[in-house]
Every structure is written in structure tokens, then in C-alpha cells.
Swiss-Prot record:
NCBIfam families: PRK00197.1, proA. Belongs to the gamma-glutamyl phosphate reductase family. The lineage of its organism: Bacteria, Pseudomonadati, Pseudomonadota, Gammaproteobacteria, Lysobacterales. This is Gamma-glutamyl phosphate reductase. Pathway: Amino-acid biosynthesis; L-proline biosynthesis; L-glutamate 5-semialdehyde from L-glutamate: step 2/2. It comes from Xanthomonas campestris pv. campestris (strain ATCC 33913 / DSM 3586 / NCPPB 528 / LMG 568 / P 25). GO terms for molecular function: glutamate-5-semialdehyde dehydrogenase activity; NADP binding. GO terms for biological process: L-proline biosynthetic process. GO terms for cellular component: cytoplasm. Gene3D superfamilies: Aldehyde Dehydrogenase, Chain A, domain 1, Aldehyde Dehydrogenase, Chain A, domain 2. It catalyses: L-glutamate 5-semialdehyde + phosphate + NADP(+) = L-glutamyl 5-phosphate + NADPH + H(+). Pfam families: Aldedh (PF00171). It is an enzyme of class 1 (oxidoreductase). Keywords: Amino-acid biosynthesis, Cytoplasm, NADP, Oxidoreductase, Proline biosynthesis.
Amino acid sequence: MTIKSLALQCRDAAQVLSQLSADAKQALLLAMANALDTDATQILQANQRDVDAAREKGTGAAMLDRLTLTPARLSAVGAALREVAVLPDPVGQVTRDDVRPNGIRVQKVRVPLGVIAMIYEARPNVTADAAALCIKAGNGVILRGGSEAIHSNTAIARALQGALREANVPEAALTLVEDLRRETMLELLQLSDIVDLAIPRGGEGLIRFVAEHARVPVIKHYKGVCHLFVDASADVDLAVRLLVDGKASRPSACNSLETLLVHADIAERFLPAAAAALRARNVELRGDAATRAVLPEIAAASDDDYAAEFLDLILAIRVVPDLDTALAHIRQYGSDHTEVIATQTPANAETFVQSLRSAVVMVNASSRFSDGGELGLGAEIGISTTRLHSYGPMGLEALTVERFVVRGEGQVRH
């Protein structure tokens, strides 16, 4: 079957989804979560095939971490689906309701987007998360994962499609593209009369390919070059906690820290404490000359290091003379994802927040909170770095649009 035929079937199924009640969608998502539990053994076996193949190819540690499903991680995926199931249904929400002077009643109402193409790499959890969010919001979803996770994605999709069938919902509402040739992805991205939105999640190469070739609207989930700026007034212990959590808790995540900026007035107090805490977590440090004056044992950082999304236990460090220099550095090297300031000066915190265009800005909180679940959205479909209708972590509302519904009693415009 051609990709166009698959997309047409998904569009037809999306029409069925859009008519389901909130209760029906909740029951469907709970059944999908249960299906993951029922098929857990097969899913984990399929994932092991992908992990073994990736190891044989010499895949890096960061990619392997994103690819790997453990029983605990798979259980967490199911738990995320259950959380989405009980979230308020955005479809049908009235966001504006007023009566015009001529008597017509004007409402703005949330409706599903339609068909969403999710294009991603080695994150099998995205298969379930994206399906759950799209279906909860009444959308059909076309999933095109990476070849690294093909067995995992197929096993997860089959389990979820089984739940759709049992609920008498066309399984095409969740369509997994198994033809992973780039030509097929290119054809999918050209289907502007069928696909309403494409969301790429993955490496820079994938996102650039989608953005450059798509004829459908694209919301990019670009790389996360995330910074922590430690201001002169920062509480050292607090800042060290933010740094260790942001860098070492899960370095392969896009909301992990990649660069540390330290105000010169606090560098001699903060850097030794930070280095000791990071070394205990096996983090490699690279710094500029001012950093190495305090930490002479670390390697020198290059311009490429400051622009890098390491997704690994590596951190670039720079000492800056003031807040303005820190902001200029972030504007030059950042990716509009997530930025953090540690400070006890409210005015500096406000300047930091107002001066950056990043999707998420944190004050005295870990970058790892830049996540749909942590911000109260339930499972997220990704973190948008595109300034369109959604910016930052994308939950259910971001997968709907508002339209006008107008009710009258025969009014005409003269």
C-alpha cells in the first residue's frame, strides 16, 4: 500500500475519532495502556533486538539510552497513557462566548487538527506517547520512527492497534509507517491535502530535512542546547543542585544542561564545588581560560563545544563578567529550548526571563522540569522550538485548533 493510501485511511479514521465522546476516548486510552502491559514481554523482546543491533553498529551511549526500554520504563509509558486518559478533553472546549450587538452568538471552540505525522528517531516511547496524545485530542496519527527502533515501534503499535480494534475504532487512526526509505518520508511530507501537521523529533539532520522538504506545516522540536547561568548572588548549594540534576540525571534528554555560565564574582567559590559534584557523577568538563584558571586540570572548550548538544556526560563552562554577557552567549549559541538562571536577585531573574526568547525559562529550578508531565500537561508530544500556535512542551491543547461557531436567528449583513 502506498503512503498516500495509508494517509487517506488515517484521515478517514480521524473523522471517526473526532466524533468520539470524552468518556469513549478515556476508555480507549486506558485499554491502550492495558495493552502495553499485556504485550510487555513481546515489546521488551523486540526492543532487545533493536538494542543488540545498535550495539553491533557501535551506536553511542546517548542513543542507546534513548533506544532502551526496561520493564520500569515500559511501565512508565503505560502510566503516562493512563495520565493522559484522565486529563480534561480539550475537544469541544469553548474559549470565547459572547453576543454581538446584532444578536449573533460568537463562540470559539477547540477542534482536532486532523492528521498529524510524527517523525522521530530512536525513542520507542514516542510511539505510545504520540499516539495517546493525538487520539485523546481526536486526531489520527501517522508514526514514522527511525530504523534503529523498528522492532520496538512495531510491537508497541501492534499492541495499541489491538485496543483500537476492540473499541471498534479503525486501527488506521494509528498508522505506523514500516517503509523507512527516505523517499517514502519525502512523499509523506508532500501530502498537504491530507496531512495537517508534521512534528519532527530527533537529530539536527532529520529536523532540517523535514523543514526543508515539507509542504505541510511543521512544528520543529529542535536540539536542546540548554544553559545554566549562575549569577553573582546565587546560593552556591542551590546552584550545584540545579547543575548536577540538569546535567547528570539523564544526560541524553533534550532538557539536560550542555553549558554552564558562571558570573566572575562567584566563580572562585562556585566552580570548585561544582566540579567536585560533577566529577562524582563522571562528567567531563571543558572550560574557557577563566574557568581553567580556577580548574586548571580540565580541558579547554572550543566554540564547537559551546554550540554542541552533547547528550552525554560532557559540560562546557564559561566565566562571564555580567548578566548581559551571559545573555549574549545564550543568544549566540542557544537553541531556544530551555534556559536556567540561579540567582537571589529578583531584578536579574526578571531581566533573564524577559530578555530571552526560549520556549522555557527557569528561575532557580532544574532544566529537567522542561517536560510536559512535570509542567502539568501529561505526556508531551515534544518540546516545540517553533514560534507557531504552540511553543515549548506540547500537550493536548497544542494538538487542537480553535474555530468560530456562530449562531443566529436569521441575521444578515447589509
